[in-house]
Amino acid sequence: DKISVTVDSSGDSSGTDGSVYIFEIKPYQNDLSGRTDYLAKGSIGANQKFSFPLHAGPGELRLYSAFVPAVKVGGRYEMIANRRYIENPEIVAENQDPALNPGKKGLRVDPNILDDALSLNIKHAGVDIPTQRFFGNGIDYTYESKTYKINKELIDQLDAEVKRLSDSGVAVTAILLNAWNQTVPELNPLGVTELPKEQAVYYGFNVESEAGFRAVKAMASFLAKRYNGKNGHGKITNWVVGNEINNQYWNYMGDYDVSAYT
């Protein structure tokens, strides 16, 4: 599989080496400082086409990366346009089945009283996944060459809940809630300390560091594969990441103004 990029460049290229370079920018990267690892190189001009592998390494896709053109000035590379993301990531999805949409009636369910919810003939159910409990012990999961330890107690609970609902024809929506994480602190927003519950209940996910980004990806990969409806654990049809993300009480990210926060 390949990623294709088309670049139109013009203007004064004096001071450069006459070439345009394509760089990958990962979510935790902001600029090209000190970098020389460009993906492709071509001539400055109109309708220049580049391609490079979708896979960055074994099992590691570039789906979440952005790509920028740059020129070489002296010994450094400088971006010459805004970053762009892959515009059709859905074509590489393993599961191309249409989403389940059995009706309008739905509830955010309590796992202890599923019978009551099902007796109301619900068609949709919201299931909370507390991500501060996700990592733990009992299940080993290897993702992008790293093995993560996952809390089997939580997964057993989710297995029972999701399977019961989806086997009953209910479309399950999982809501990933990131309370302060003592087990895997890299999931907590950078530069933020835990606040009293009356000030913040949940926190935004940290994808500003490589460790946080990879932990979030590993968690998403495990959950998506386990609850794809094809391996006996039930199916999660929809995913909600965070809660009330425009409100710092429910999705705390630190001391930002509105513009920076959004």
Where are the regions that the model predicts?
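Beta-strand acidic-aromatic groove motif in beta-rich domains, primarily in extracellular
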Residues: 15-21, 174, 182-189
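Catalytic domains of carbohydrate-active enzymes, especially glycoside hydrolases
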Residues: 104-138, 160-177
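Mature N-terminal, pre-catalytic/accessory segment of carbohydrate-active enzymes
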Residues: 1-112
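Active-site cleft segment of glycoside hydrolase catalytic domains centered on the general acid/base Glu
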Residues: 187-262
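Short, solvent-exposed loop/turn and secondary-structure capping segments
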Residues: 117-119, 136-137, 177, 183-189, ...
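Short helix-terminating capping/connector loops at secondary-structure junctions
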Residues: 100, 166-167, 231-236
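Acidic/aromatic-lined carbohydrate-recognition and catalytic surfaces
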Residues: 130-154, 167, 171, 177-182, ...
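Generic structural signal for well-ordered alpha-helices
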Residues: 113-115, 158-163, 220-224, 262
